[in-house]
Amino acid sequence: MMIAGIDEAGKGPVIGPMCIGGVKIEESRAHILKVLGVADSKKLTPKKREQLAAQIKKHADGFFVLEVSPSQIDELRKIMTMNEIMVVCFSKVLEQLKPDLLYADAADVNAERFATNIRKQYSKTNPDHAKEIEIISMHQADATYPVVSAASIIAKVRRDELIEELKKEWGLDFGSGYPSDPKTKEFLLNWGKEHSGEFPEIVRQSWQTVENIREELKKTGNKN
């Protein structure tokens, strides 16, 4: 039986893309992932993640990373919620892997609903397989199922690569891109002041953080 895991990296940041990773492996060989030492990607150092990502790709029967740019996220948010966007993205990765059993890290407060919605979305493109596939969704699935940990790792490594590329391309150091990062907040505030509340394409314009900065600049009359 072919099993797969899907997880995201970069759902919350205000800067940079979101990556959704998927890893597929024959269930009888899935113990290899445990032997490799995959764990929740957030608990690993960037170097260890990179090493593991290479090993995962070598041993997996299939893998795929979907990249969603800030502008794509902004456009989608005009017509759907973030939860609905996650369903569409997970389904797109599922289309590439087509396992017999999917373990998905729940991107919804209701894990069961998330699984149901993935099946519904997936049935639009793969109606027959959508009836057969077993989908198990749970919170922190990356800490329970090694195949989800593996998906989390390849997603995180790809997002980190893209963030570094953006920093080089723009000649900027905006920190991690997460709203809670002081360096990210400082970058956004300074950029907003210098560009009359307009932000570059690497920023998710629909994020509350950006709205807050725009409001703040309006109140202060955009003074440097």
Swiss-Prot record:
Catalytic activity: Endonucleolytic cleavage to 5'-phosphomonoester
InterPro entries: RNase_H2_suA (IPR004649), RNase_HII/HIII (IPR001352), RNase_HII/HIII_dom (IPR024567), RNase_HII_arc (IPR020787), RNase_HII_hlx-loop-hlx_cap_dom (IPR023160), RNaseH-like_sf (IPR012337), RNaseH_sf (IPR036397)
Domain of life: Archaea
Any single Gene Ontology cellular-component annotation: ribonuclease H2 complex
Positions of a divalent metal cation binding: 7-8, 105
EC numbers for this chain: 3.1.26.4
Cofactor binding note from Swiss-Prot or TrEMBL: Manganese or magnesium. Binds 1 divalent metal ion per monomer in the absence of substrate. May bind a second metal ion after substrate binding.
Main location: cytoplasm
Biological function: Endonuclease that specifically degrades the RNA of RNA-DNA hybrids.
Homology family: Belongs to the RNase HII family.
Record protein name field: Ribonuclease HII
Organism: Methanosarcina barkeri (strain Fusaro / DSM 804)
